[in-house]
Regions:
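Sec-dependent N-terminal signal peptides
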Residues: 2-11
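Compositionally biased, intrinsically disordered low-complexity segments enriched
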Residues: 25-26, 47, 99, 124, ...
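C-terminal motif of bacterial Sec signal peptides marking the signal peptidase cleavage site
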Residues: 15-18
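Active-site-adjacent loop/helix surface patches within enzyme catalytic domains
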Residues: 67-86, 93-218
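Basic/polar, cationic surfaces and motifs that engage anionic cell-wall
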Residues: 2, 20-37, 43, 49, ...
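Intrinsically disordered, low-complexity segments enriched in serine/threonine/proline/glycine
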Residues: 10, 47-48
Length: 255
């Protein structure tokens, strides 16, 4: 997804479909997540083994809470970004985006909110590996926007009423009409501008860890795509990310 920067918030919103159905008062304070007990997104599945015991391999597998605790995540939830309950059972995809602006995640969150377009991804990954989460895991965020005609069917998603669609504009063209991805996915924004250098190793390692956490949270491996796979007119992720994207889709790490 192309998210334009702080000084071009309106243009940023044109690449996203945004709306909001506040479910709680905005929490503009930031909560640093340092241990599993603090986070509100510790996992959709139980951290305990099934009755009757678990194998040694299962016992050694990190829980979602443990994986989250290893990440430098700051929660900065804004009610304008929450578009209804997604439900863990609907999670199918992780959609990777570039921010297309070289700003901090905290600044980008503020820019999204001030634009009034109600667009956001669940996570933004800074170049230093720190992460801001601005939408809960099981809430719908407007990060994918409209996709190519036929993509709802191709990707097995639909507009089934869970997305409130408030703030969403009309389909931009006859070839870009499908709008189901937001309700079935987690969006990850990567702070990067196309053509302006490599993705730092610390950032890539944070993405690795975030994907592992999401997998553990839902107790399943979501299919990894980037924004231009959903909507062919988009440019993100960049050409510099192509090898990493192939690796993520194949074995879920960047290398």
């Amino acid at each position: 997804m192309r998210l334009i920067g702080i000084l071009a918030a309106a243009a940023l919103a044109c690449t996203l479909a945004g709306c909001a159905a506040p479910q709680q008062q905005p929490d503009h304070s930031q909560l640093k997540v340092n241990d599993a007990g603090v986070s509100s997104d510790g996992g959709a599945q139980s951290d305990e083994g099934a009755e009757g015991g678990v194998s040694s391999a299962e016992e050694a597998k990190p829980t979602a809470s443990e994986l989250r605790a290893k990440l430098d995540i700051t929660e900065d939830y804004r009610s304008d970004f929450n578009h209804g309950e997604k439900g863990a059972s609907y999670q199918k995809y992780i959609v990777l985006h570039d921010t297309e602006v070289d700003s901090s995640a905290a600044s980008i969150v503020n820019s999204w909110e001030s634009s009034g377009n109600k667009v956001a991804s669940q996570f933004i990954v800074n170049k230093d590996g720190s992460i801001v989460q601005c939408v809960p895991m099981d809430a719908i965020a407007h990060h994918a926007g409209y996709g190519d005609a036929g993509h709802n069917s191709e990707y097995g998603v639909s507009e089934d009423g869970r997305d409130d669609k408030r703030g969403t504009t009309k389909a931009p063209s006859k070839s870009i009409t499908d709008y189901g991805m937001n309700s079935y996915s987690i969006g990850i924004e990567i702070v990067h501008v196309s053509g302006q250098g490599a993705y730092p190793e610390t950032q890539l390692e944070a993405i690795d860890g975030l994907i592992a956490y999401i997998d553990a949270y839902y107790d399943s491996e979501s299919t990894i795509i980037d924004h231009k796979m959903w909507r062919s007119g988009n440019s993100d992720t960049s050409a510099e990310f192509a090898t990493y994207l192939a690796n993520y889709r194949d074995h879920r790490t960047h290398n």
